[in-house]
Amino acid sequence: ELCGDMVNVIRKPDETILVLADGMGSGVKANILATLTSKIISTLMSGDADIDECVETISETLPVCSVRGIAYSTFTIVRVKHNGEIYTAEFDGPEFVMLRDGVLEEPEKEMRVISGKEIWESHFTAKPGDMIISFSDGVIHAGIGRLINLGWKRVNVMEFIQRNYRPHISARVMTKDLVSVCDHLYEGEPGDDTTVAAVHIMPRTTTRVMVGPASSPDM
């Protein structure tokens, strides 16, 4: 069955845009909703559109479910300017988790209603080493009705992320560790699509490569 979550990343010379979307329902319908949402938002934002235009476009574009009569996908946007400015926007999904020097941070957020949707936005300046971890609700549903009656709540996810942090841990390792725990809580049989995406703020590094003639004239 197709995954109902989708992550899209666009890299530009001066910024990186990450969008995680979770389509309503499951299978093909959810996949279509999540794919359209992530693609539309990332493409528009890479062209300097604001969140208002993105949400309005999604509302006019997403196919309406014939059963529920609505078109719906949650999303989390993380926009990283290469000067350190961060913009995030969240709609109806689990809130992202942020680490700074291994300590949990909660950036100040403001809510705006755009096209009938409550969008939570934040603006802040990142520091080297900051990590922003976003995830679909499959993470906080992990273990529900199995190892954990009420699922793995966000506070539990935050505690795990902080315990798992160590200096120089990569975004790839952090996301892999988080997904592995979810798989364990689901006992290898996920009850919901589970997706984790992380952004790790790192200073730009320069690599120099020296190339010379072969040691043997025959080469």
Name each model-derived stretch.
Residues 3, 31-102, 119-120, 169-204:
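Catalytic core of PPM/PP2C metal-dependent serine/threonine phosphatase domains
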Residues 22-23, 93, 131-139, 193:
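DG-centered beta-turn motif at the end of beta-strands
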Residues 75, 84, 95-126, 132, ...:
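Small-residue (GG/TT-enriched) beta-loop-alpha framework at ligand/catalytic clefts
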Residues 13-17, 128-131, 192, 206:
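Short hydrophobic/glycine-rich mini-motifs in sensory/regulatory modules
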Residues 8-19, 26-32:
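N-terminal glycine-rich anion-binding loops that anchor highly charged ligand groups
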